[in-house]
């Protein structure tokens, strides 16, 4: 595969995450009203998706080691498109939650394989450079997801925001069929043996570096997705923004995420990995604390939320 093709594929495969989680958020209040669902039920369309996304990778990783990246990508993206279409057609919140759960598991195939492909094809230093270029593409997709979703919802209704990920998945699937060349040099026939799986997981869980960075990642994503799950209801129903205006607020957040990825490269050269991660932790803690203090003080406005999110999103981009 040509380097440009690899970067494009990686950007699309990684970008499927914000397409799936961010693009439909402006439509969440309208979706709830149309399906007669409570806010908690509607939020399950995100939390169930994320749970399936995380758990599926525990199985999809060994499957891709055994059978190769391309079969997992093909089956995963096909399932993603079908689940997205099922979500568009769902007549009830319960069926939508089921469709989104399948969509989350399928999304895991795309994101997991994208990172595995980098490891297959590149040495660590070269892989980091390729991944940084792909993450720039991811940043652009993340910036556009919520504004496009808000505009589509305002113009065509909430189901349009669920249809667009199906289109994105279909385009990505076509590119994988057309351009992707299997990246695993030697498939591992023992990858799915229970003993192999247990030994591998044991080695990983006993690694203190993994545990530390896993905790960091959980905190960073936990903070982000807790905000995402409630943000559309707060900004649209409480603060009175339109779907398009809400999308622009999310665009603001994504810009700071992209800025964080650039700041990360600069800080890595000056402070190393540990110093960079420590500084990102301080930023996230400062932003979250400020937001909490303002909320407890009764300050309710768009900027009381958007401004404290700046250091939080910077930190997320760094992490």
Where are these regions (language model features)?
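Helix-breaking motifs and short loop linkers at transmembrane-helix boundaries and internal kinks
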Residues: 34-36, 68, 89-95, 106, ...
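Conserved MFS/SLC helix-loop-helix module at the cytosolic interface between two early adjacent transmembrane helices
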Residues: 55-94
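Structural signature of the two symmetry-related core transmembrane helices
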Residues: 71-85, 275-291
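Paired small-residue
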Residues: 79, 83-86, 94-102, 303-311
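Cytoplasmic helix-loop-helix junction between adjacent transmembrane helices
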Residues: 99-140
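Juxtamembrane intracellular "pre-TM" segments in multi-pass secondary transporters
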Residues: 183-213
């Amino acid at each position: 595969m040509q380097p440009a093709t690899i970067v494009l594929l990686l950007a699309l495969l990684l970008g499927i995450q914000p397409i799936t989680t961010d693009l439909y958020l402006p439509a969440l209040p309208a979706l709830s009203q149309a399906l007669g669902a409570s806010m908690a039920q509607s939020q399950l369309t995100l939390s169930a998706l994320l749970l399936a996304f995380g758990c599926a990778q525990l199985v999809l990783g060994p499957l891709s080691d055994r059978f190769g990246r391309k079969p997992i990508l093909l089956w995963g993206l096909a399932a993603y498109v079908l689940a997205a279409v099922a979500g568009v057609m769902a007549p009830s919140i319960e069926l939508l939650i089921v469709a989104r759960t399948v969509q989350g598991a399928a999304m895991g195939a795309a994101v997991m394989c994208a990172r595995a492909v980098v490891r297959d094809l590149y040495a660590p230093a070269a892989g980091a450079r390729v991944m940084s270029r792909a993450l720039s593409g991811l940043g652009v997709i993340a910036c556009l997801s919520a504004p496009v979703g808000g505009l589509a919802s305002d113009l065509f209704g909430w189901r349009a925001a669920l249809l667009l990920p199906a289109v994105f998945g279909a385009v990505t699937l076509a590119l994988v069929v057309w351009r992707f060349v299997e990246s695993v040099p030697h498939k591992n026939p023992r990858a799915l043996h229970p003993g192999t799986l247990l030994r591998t997981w044991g080695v990983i869980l006993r690694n203190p570096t993994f545990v530390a960075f896993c905790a960091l990642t959980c905190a960073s994503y936990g903070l982000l997705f807790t905000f995402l799950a409630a943000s559309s209801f707060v900004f649209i129903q409480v603060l009175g923004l339109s779907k398009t205006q809400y999308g622009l607020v999310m665009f603001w957040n994504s810009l700071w995420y992209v800025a964080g990825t650039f700041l990360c490269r600069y800080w890595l050269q000056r402070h190393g990995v540990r110093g960079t991660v420590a500084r990102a932790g301080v930023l996230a803690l400062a932003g979250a604390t400020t937001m909490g203090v303002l909320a407890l003080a009764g300050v309710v406005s768009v900027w009381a939320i958007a401004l404290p999110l700046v250091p939080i999103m910077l930190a997320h981009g760094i992490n």
